[in-house]
């Protein structure tokens, strides 16, 4: 059984997890081509290898939407209301159009179903009425689907993770300032080991948690 260990002491975000998984692939350049071939509309995916302390190097993802690069650490505003809102059905429609194995599609859908359920509990409304903010944007869909595709390609059968560092302080969202972890993220982390810190910023995002 192939087991993956994730050190999440500094949190978990979709783009960072995708870069970490890509670093494990024997041919990252070929894998980036497969990620691009998923066919997320208007999206260009590239990656570069960067120095990473004394341990060596790591892959950093670059996602461009219609020629504009999204902020790689957009978890700072994943709850922002300054973005086009995407419904659960809207995200599912995008996933249904992607050129990916059904098994990968099902895993990506499961991630978004978990997010929708957590948002439903946090806001006290039916899942059908949930509107995703940043997590419904195309770069987040790339993060989620890309991670699911990489896990399948790498033939990972079991994932073990350290306690997840969630950060601290507050995060700004459409409903004002919320403590970290935000309510929806806290629901997503139920059953998992997590810890406050390090620092006073949001380290575990609504996409990183369910992934």
Annotate each predicted stretch with a short phrase.
Residues 1-4:
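Extreme N-terminal starter segment of soluble prokaryotic enzymes
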Residues 6-20, 132-155:
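Conserved phosphate/anionic-ligand binding catalytic regions in large, soluble enzymes, centered on
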Residues 9-10, 37-39, 51, 136-138, ...:
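Acidic, glycine-rich active-site loops and adjacent beta-strand->loop/helix elements
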Residues 23-123, 182, 191-209:
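Glycine-rich nucleotide/cofactor/substrate-binding loop typically near the N-terminus or early
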Residues 24-33, 152-162:
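Phosphate-handling active-site elements
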Residues 156-211:
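Mobile "lid/hinge" segments at catalytic clefts and subdomain interfaces of large enzymes
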